């Protein structure tokens, strides 16, 4: 057999080994996750094989997902801070982390962690996510009206609202802005719209939890 061909085959085989091991590790992880076995998950992510085959962010993110499944706010907080303080992240990873935990901190009204996440996302190129987070923070946490004109204009545009799956949540945010302005009748009007339009959508439970 040609020597170069042998080298190519060996390289191909070596290249597939981490992939095979990674798949096996992730399969074990999913089994442990189903059983809510956090200690075993932590032990698994700390193994040499996991450290070789799974990048640092992915390992820590998998552990965070386990805490999210258990709704363990204390451990979620610890793990998020651990990732932000010690794990190098690219823009996509920063956005993924923020999306995973932002609304937990909104529900808990944890302004300091919301500020940390906003600062982190501001360093990415995900401008839409930053705007969404800033809008929620200003409206729900700070009691502001910064996005009043923008939301009012968007929601008065029938074409925009008809094709926008986010409409129920935008209606909810506008209802809160009206409340922040002291306009209870308009606040109630948009709150009722939000509750009605969110039925059967991903926003239904979110709006009710923040209502």
Regions found by a protein language model. Give the residues of each.
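Alpha-helical transmembrane signal-anchor/signal-peptide segments
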Residues: 26-38
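Extracytoplasmic/periplasmic C-terminal soluble domains
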Residues: 138-211
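Acidic, Ser/Thr-rich low-complexity segments on the non-lumenal side of membrane proteins
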Residues: 41-73
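Structural motif corresponding to the intra-repeat A-B loop/turn of tetratricopeptide repeats
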Residues: 35, 70, 107-108, 142-145, ...
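Alpha-helical repeat scaffolds
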Residues: 40-48, 73-86, 110-125, 146-162, ...
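Residue at a conserved register position within TPR or TPR-like alpha-solenoid repeats
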Residues: 32, 67, 101, 105, ...
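Generic helix N-cap/helix-start motif at coil->alpha-helix transitions
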Residues: 17-27, 52-61, 90-99, 125-136, ...
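N-terminal signal-anchor transmembrane alpha helix of single-pass membrane proteins
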Residues: 1-29
């Amino acid at each position: 057999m040609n020597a170069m061909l042998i080298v190519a085959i060996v390289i191909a085989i070596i290249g597939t080994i981490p992939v095979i091991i990674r798949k096996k590790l992730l399969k074990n992880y999913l089994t442990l996750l189903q059983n809510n076995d956090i200690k075993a998950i932590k032990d698994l992510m700390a193994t040499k094989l996991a450290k070789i085959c799974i990048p640092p962010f992915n390992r820590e993110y998998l552990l965070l997902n386990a805490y999210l499944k258990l709704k363990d706010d204390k451990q979620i907080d610890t793990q998020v801070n651990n990732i932000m303080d010690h794990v190098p992240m690219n823009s996509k990873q920063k956005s993924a982390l923020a999306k995973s935990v932002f609304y937990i901190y909104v529900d808990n009204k944890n302004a300091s962690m919301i500020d940390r996440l906003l600062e982190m996302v501001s360093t990415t190129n995900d401008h839409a996510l930053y705007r969404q987070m800033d809008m929620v923070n200003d409206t729900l946490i700070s009691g502001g009206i910064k996005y009043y004109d923008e939301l009012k204009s968007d929601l008065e545009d029938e074409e925009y609202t008809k094709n926008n799956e986010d409409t129920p949540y935008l209606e909810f945010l506008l209802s809160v802005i009206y409340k922040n302005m002291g306009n209870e009748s308009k606040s109630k009007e948009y709150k009722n719209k939000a509750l009605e339009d969110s039925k059967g959508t991903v926003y239904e439970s979110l709006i009710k939890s923040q209502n």
